[in-house]
UniProtKB/Swiss-Prot annotation:
GO molecular function: histidine-tRNA ligase activity
UniProt subcellular location: Cytoplasm
Assembly notes: Heteromultimer composed of HisG and HisZ subunits.
Broad class of where this protein is predominantly found: cytoplasm
Family membership noted in the UniProt record: Belongs to the class-II aminoacyl-tRNA synthetase family. HisZ subfamily.
Record GO biological process: histidyl-tRNA aminoacylation; L-histidine biosynthetic process
NCBIfam families the UniProt entry points to: PRK12292.1-1, PRK12421.1
Record-level GO cellular component terms: cytoplasm
Protein name: ATP phosphoribosyltransferase regulatory subunit
Length: 384
């Protein structure tokens, strides 16, 4: 095999795409900062018990594992940064009030999580800790929408759900983990036949409720249908009222509901949201509430947030037009260097043509040139 061939679903990022990614990264972090979120940078690898605490089987299978040559302990390359940020909040910051944190960095997956996806996403996310009310859920949705607007994503729609509905149905019956996984998979896939088989050993009331949940997706009328179909489910009124309140603050946006949407990581414990875009084949943002995510670190705190893959956004958003550069001759004189430095300080891109390469095509598009006229350096338009 050729030495330059990369593993499947791993790719180099070339200059034009790298510029686009970096512009989005800066813009997303600045947008989060505008809401008061502080940037943190967790490490690329951690001990497995820290990375995978409370995350479920799906994330375990997505995590690359190896042995630390220093300690002999098992460590993993992160597949998701949510647990890492929860650890930072719980032990390193240890604040008592509301804490807002954001992050951006590469994660690694053993398998792509969607068709044609990279196994090295560039994950951006934001988390708010310390507030259990609907306001934190809503802020997460609004920040995610503002991030997509900044990126130029069009045709956005929001899908709302809540992990407590199905969890409340299954908790009293103590179903085994294999059955629970089958039920969750059937609900996520909207597979009525598989759901019927997976829930065959459950009480009849639970089976009826699960079958009802499978059909509870669509516009706001779904909430009224859920009140009737799930009237015997404890806490369902609170769940539905919370979803209705979040949707009310998203007036003017396309909002739908899907009480069987259980896709994504298993640590969600309350309201969830998924954001879709016109040109994307899969969700561009997943988020919600995960109050139990810090329990493994000895400090359970209310938490809500979201994450997205910047590389996925690059595939659906056209890059901004690159400002044309100034072409300059190579001039080893102090006055030329000073003038070029002034131009660069003013935000201009100045590309110096190295000796012997004057006739070669430049990597940057140039529409002006630096010339020396009557002993003075000046910028003039390139003749075409």
């Amino acid at each position: 095999m050729s030495a330059w061939v990369l593993p499947d679903h791993i790719a180099d990022v070339l200059p034009s795409e790298a510029r686009h990614i970096e512009e989005l990264r800066r813009g997303l972090i600045d947008t989060a900062r505008g809401y008061g979120y502080e940037l943190v940078m967790p490490p690329m690898l951690e001990h497995l018990e820290s990375l995978l605490s409370g995350t479920g089987e799906a994330l375990d299978l997505q995590t690359f594992k190896l042995v630390d040559q220093l300690s002999g302990r098992s460590i993993g390359l992160r597949a998701d940064m949510t647990q890492q940020v929860a650890r930072i909040d719980a032990h390193l910051l240890n604040r008592s009030g509301v804490t807002r944190l954001c992050y951006c960095g590469p994660v690694l997956h053993t398998r792509p999580d969607r068709p044609r996806a990279t196994r090295e996403p560039l994950q951006f996310g934001a988390e708010i800790y310390g507030h259990s009310g609907m306001e934190a859920d809503l802020e997460s949705v609004l920040l995610a929408l503002d991030c997509l607007h900044l990126a130029g994503v069009e045709g956005v729609s929001v899908d709302l759900s809540d992990a407590r509905v199905v969890r409340t149905l299954l908790e009293p019956i103590a179903a085994d983990s294999a059955t629970v996984r089958r039920i969750y998979a059937a609900l996520a896939a909207k597979d009525a036949s598989e759901l019927s088989q997976a829930s065959a050993g459950l009480p009849s009331g639970t089976r009826r409720a699960l079958s009802a949940v499978l059909e509870l997706y669509g516009d706001a009328s779904v909430l009224d249908e859920a009140r009737t179909a799930l009237s015997d489910v404890a806490g369902v009124e609170e769940v539905l009222a919370n979803l209705k309140s979040i949707a009310a603050h998203l007036e003017g946006r396309t909002v739908s509901f899907d009480l069987a949407d259980l896709r994504g990581y298993s640590y969600y414990s309350g309201a969830r949201f998924t954001i879709y875009a016109r040109n994307a084949t899969d969700a561009v943002v997943r988020g919600g509430r995960y109050d139990e995510v810090g329990a493994a670190f000895g400090r359970t705190r209310p938490a809500a947030g979201f994450s997205l893959d910047i590389k996925q956004l690059v595939g659906i958003v056209p890059p901004r037009t690159l400002k044309a550069a100034i072409r300059a001759p190579w001039a080893a004189t102090p006055d030329a260097h000073r003038f070029i430095a002034q131009l660069r300080s003013a935000g201009e891109t100045v590309v110096c043509v190295l000796p012997g390469h004057e006739s070669q095509v430049q990597e940057f598009q140039c529409d002006r040139e630096l010339v020396l006229e009557q002993g003075q350096w000046m910028v003039r338009p390139l003749p075409y």
